[in-house]
Amino acid sequence: MGMFGVAFGLGFTFGPLAGGLIAGSNYTQETLSLVAWLASAINLLNLIFVITSFKETLPKEKAIQLKKNELSKQIEVVKNPMLFPYFLLIFFIYAVFSGMEGTIAVWTKETFTWGPKEVGFVMLLAGFCQIIVQGFLLRVLIKKFDEIKLIASGFISLILGFSLIPTENIYLIPLAIVFLSYGIGISNPCINSILSKKSENNKGLVLGTGYSCQAAARFIGQPLAGFIFLNFGKNVPFYFDAVFLVMVALGYMFLYKNIRKQA
């Protein structure tokens, strides 16, 4: 799971940086359009690569059978009391994190008059931290601590990161990014690892449901953060994220106790 995070971190490192450098600090409609066209071209190349290089590993007969029972199995997975709390965790974490992703560029523009170039370097730091966390640090920590404790440390780190941003201290922003990157970088693979262990016969379906939770969280998190940003102030979304995660952590402690009783 950690290596998937490393791959994501590499993209998160160089993608925003390249886009920021191309757009520049004093961006124009033309430079922003160029970034969009380049991103589209890269996606097209990626599509061609997938079509020509990857083969379906699931036999056709099994695929047809899975399609027939897909909806019922999906419902069973979501209703599973051993899995549902972790799906909720994924949803909540990515809802607040995607909200930060959607507002941080506008926030830095209003607070520090930063442009795409400066935000690109912020994303460079975030991506680099995720590579370190998921590619190296996770391997060390997982030998000393179980996934539950690492998820808890991720929550604490996310709460600290969201709390530091509204200070509007330019020197604390890198520290906030480090906290946020550790939080998301350590929590996500640990949750996926737990889901994988608890689903011996339906790993693909369970992990796929987890990724669906991520997508749903982004669908809700970014518009909600934008609404709060516009109507209640630029710092309120980050305070909201921190307080919300504290509430989620308390609820998670309650759920985890129930899970242990059932185990």
Positions of PLM-derived features:
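A membrane-interface helix-boundary motif in multi-pass transporters
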Residues: 24-40, 227-245
